């Protein structure tokens, strides 16, 4: 059995948690998040706590038991505090701008890259080289951040590209001329 799964998740005062047909809905000041779990895990809400129990003794049920608890704990944290990821753009002429519900990236290509901002995500751009992705859904914040970074990952020779703040880019030496 999972030691993580045995611990209940406590619900803060300003958060509402409900379960319907294996789907957990968490609503709080920062937004609303929902996640559907496999029928191998039973999720119950009682007196300001969410508890988890495997419905069968299979290996899959034991694995999902702790995973479900961790995901719901992350959902509660997301709707109370929120998640943020900061990106940094390095390179001559590389910049980012917000145009309505789209993020406009100029990354050295012949065309601008327009990224539609998904529902539940807030993007802020400061001085055209710093992008902050915020939201209540941890998975969605990470996915949007990875998508932005994927347009031009940092390259090892000059170091230009889109990187997550704090990410260490391994630098390489260029060709040596004899």
Curated annotation (Swiss-Prot):
It comes from the Bacteria. The keyword Hydrolase does not apply. SUPFAM superfamilies: Ribosomal protein L6. One of its GO terms (molecular function) is rRNA binding. GO terms for cellular component: cytosolic large ribosomal subunit. One of its GO terms (biological process) is cytoplasmic translation. Keywords: Ribonucleoprotein, Ribosomal protein, RNA-binding, rRNA-binding. NCBIfam families: L6_bact. Part of the 50S ribosomal subunit. Belongs to the universal ribosomal protein uL6 family. This protein binds to the 23S rRNA, and is important in its secondary structure. It is located near the subunit interface in the base of the L7/L12 stalk, and near the tRNA binding site of the peptidyltransferase center. This is Large ribosomal subunit protein uL6.
């Amino acid at each position: 059995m999972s030691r993580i799964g045995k611990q209940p998740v406590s619900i803060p005062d300003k958060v509402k948690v409900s379960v319907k047909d294996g789907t957990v809905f968490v609503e709080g000041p920062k937004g609303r998040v929902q996640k559907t779990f496999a029928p191998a895990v039973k999720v119950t809400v009682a007196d300001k706590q969410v508890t988890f129990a495997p419905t069968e003794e299979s290996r899959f049920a034991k694995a999902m038991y702790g995973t479900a608890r961790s995901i719901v704990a992350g959902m509660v944290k997301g709707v109370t505090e929120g998640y943020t990821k900061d990106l940094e753009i390095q390179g001559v002429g590389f910049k980012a701008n917000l145009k309505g519900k789209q993020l406009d990236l100029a990354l050295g290509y012949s065309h601008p890259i327009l990224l539609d901002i998904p529902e539940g995500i807030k993007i802020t751009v400061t001085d055209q080289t710093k992008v902050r992705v915020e939201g209540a859904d941890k998975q969605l914040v990470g996915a949007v951040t990875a998508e932005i970074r994927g347009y031009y990952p940092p390259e090892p020779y000059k170091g230009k590209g889109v990187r997550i703040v704090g990410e260490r880019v391994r630098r390489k030496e260029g060709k040596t001329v004899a």
